[in-house]
Amino acid sequence: MQILVTGGTGFIGRSLCTRLLAEGHDPIVLTRRPGRNPQPGVRSVAALDEVGPVQAVVNLAGEPLMDGRWTDERKQALRDSRIGTTQALLAWMVGLPERPRVLVSGSAIGWYGPRDSAPLDETASPGHDFAAMLCRHWEAEALKAEDLGVRTCVLRTGIVLEREGGALQKMLPPFRMGLGGPMGDGRQWMSWIHREDLVGMILWLLTRDQARGAYNGTAPGTVTNRTFATTLGEVLHRPARLTTPAFALKLGFGEMSGLLLTGQNVQPAHALAEGFVFQYPSLEGALQAIVGAPDR
């Protein structure tokens, strides 16, 4: 398939494009800087009118949630990069003589808002904080593609784990020095997924004709923040007992600290029920694969 990828130069998008090429697909990346960090075999375009016919769209565009305090200006940038990009994709699809067969659009488990320990599947109610409202509006725009005859899946992604990006990249330096540990009381849930499993789930949704609607992009082995810190310390053979106080996170990150001090126990119910198989269902196995080997 010819597949348009927004956010294709990012932490998840580049890995996805590599996998698409390996499986014989033709990824086309929409980016503001087509000449920056090119991937061999991947065509980059700066505007939608340069794309040409595609059979699928993967919409991963979005400014990182954790890069900077949530000022009013920052919040607007987060909205524009997600909701605005999705609206532009829908407007582009309307004018196409032949529309894509499928759209897989990003979202996040922030859709559920801060929750207690009760497991959440895709039928759970949404939250009402900023992150939840951002995800709700983002998904609502993407699902309008169904009205155009485009099979649409929204992927509510958890904490994506790999060593060269995302949350784990920021965590590794202090943990390797023995300075890691839980955040706040450590009881908040962390719903995570290995990047290889997330990329695999995107391909699975692209090619599975029955798939549509919301899917949780999380591994089944959710853990508390304290367990995550302990497990990472064990894999690295380092102590992980240095707690970061909640007040320090609130002081440093403001409203955004809620993403660190609260969580959700999100389960991939739809993916499991429909036959998706995780390579890394447990946290220890995922972390061993990422940072446990001697050469990593």
Language-model segments: residues:
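N-terminal Rossmann NAD(P)H-binding glycine-rich loop of SDR-like oxidoreductase domains
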Residues: 3-23
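NAD(P)H-binding glycine-rich loop region in Rossmannoid oxidoreductase-like domains
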Residues: 35-88
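Conserved Rossmann-fold NAD(P)-dependent oxidoreductase catalytic core, especially the SDR/UDP-sugar
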Residues: 87-129
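Conserved beta-loop-beta element that borders a ligand/cofactor-binding pocket
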Residues: 107, 140-163
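Glycine/proline-rich active-site loop of Rossmann-fold NAD(P)-dependent oxidoreductases
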Residues: 136, 148-150, 161-170, 205-215
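Alpha-helical substrate-binding/gating segment
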Residues: 172-180, 188-222
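Mid/C-terminal beta-alpha module of Rossmann-like enzyme folds, strongest
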Residues: 208-255, 288-296
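C-terminal amphipathic/interface module of NAD(P)-dependent oxidoreductases
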Residues: 258-296
